Structures are given as C-alpha cells and as structure tokens.
A protein has these predicted regions:
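Bacterial N-terminal signal peptides that target proteins for export
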Residues: 1-8
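Hydrophobic helical h-region of N-terminal Sec-dependent signal peptides
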Residues: 10-14
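Amphipathic, coiled-coil-like alpha-helical scaffolding segments used for oligomerization/assembly
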Residues: 89, 118-176
Length: 176
C-alpha cells in the first residue's frame, strides 16, 4: 500500500514538472521575445532570445516570435498636395526590417503582431514623410527635381523609422 502511494506521488510530481515546462522553436530570421506574465518583473525581458529552442514556464511566461528579415510592403495609394496646391498620387512600396536586437522594444511599445504595426503605425509614418516633404516644393520643383525630392522623402522616412527601431532598406514612391 505504501509503495502505491509513493508511486502515485512520483507520477503526480512527474506530470506537474512536465506541464510546467514549455518549448518554443524560434525560426531562423526571427527573434523570440520572452514575456513574464506575473511577478514584480512582469513584462518583456530586455534580452532577445536567439533562434532555435527556447524553454520556458508556460504558466508564468510567454514567447512571441518577431521576424527580423527584410519585408516588402506595398501600401495602398493616397494623394498629397504640393506647396502650390496641386495634387500628386503616391503608391509607395517599402522594404524594411526591425533593427537588430530591437524587437523587444518594438513589442514593448506596440504590443501587437508585427504585421499590424507595419500596416498601421508605420503606414502613418510613410504618409507623413511624403506630406511633410512634398509640402516644401511646388509642382514645377517636384517634377524638375524628382530625384532630389524622393531622396529627401527617403531620408525623412528613414530617420522616423529608425526612432521606432525599424531600418528602411528601400523606398519606391510611385509618385504620379
């Protein structure tokens, strides 16, 4: 009888210890972000987890996966007015990525999936960059110096995205 109780206790201990151990495989090209759900240090850990196997306690922690490779986004077209009031159509496509090691800061700030951040918040930065830069030039200046105008837009957007821990790789304006 005593041995049955000991066996039951051992089985219970084994089941509890196995259920308190979580495993997540973080793919190559992604960073795993470990979030503490409880306690005085709850929130996002400051350290990005490397790719590969990640062991964690599923009762007190959760692991999110953020892609860190270059992604190309084709935003919907919109219109912007130049300094003299003429209207230009913009159909932007950008290639960007999270700055290396910055995925915990991005997750901490937005608490959303990366696609939601790119299609929401970052789209606003794209529209602002075009609006701010095109409002500085007249129609003639934009048409005559398109390369210079697009470089100014790209520099403005790159600086704005860097503040949000994103790195702009390429911008195609689709300016018409």
């Amino acid at each position: 009888m005593k041995s049955k109780v000991i066996m039951c206790l051992m089985a219970l201990f084994t089941m509890l210890s196995m259920s308190s151990c979580g495993y997540e495989r973080v793919d190559a090209g992604c960073e795993g972000i470990k979030v503490n759900l409880y306690g005085s240090d709850k929130g996002v850990d400051d350290v990005s987890l490397v790719t590969g196997a990640v062991w964690y306690n599923p009762f007190t922690e959760q692991v999110y996966e953020y892609p860190t490779y270059v992604q190309t986004v084709d935003y919907p077209a919109f219109t912007i007015n130049a300094k003299d009031g003429s209207e230009f159509s913009i159909d932007p496509t950008i290639s960007l990525k999270i700055a290396d090691g910055k995925s915990p800061q991005v997750f901490k700030k937005y608490r959303k999936e990366l696609a939601d951040v790119i299609n929401g918040t970052l789209f606003n930065y794209v529209k602002d960059a075009f609006r701010i830069q095109l409002n500085k030039y007249t129609t003639d200046e934009i048409v005559s110096n398109r390369d210079m105008v697009e470089k100014a837009i790209e520099a403005h957007l790159s600086k704005a995205l860097l503040k949000e821990n994103f790195q702009l790789e390429q911008l195609t304006s689709g300016l018409k």
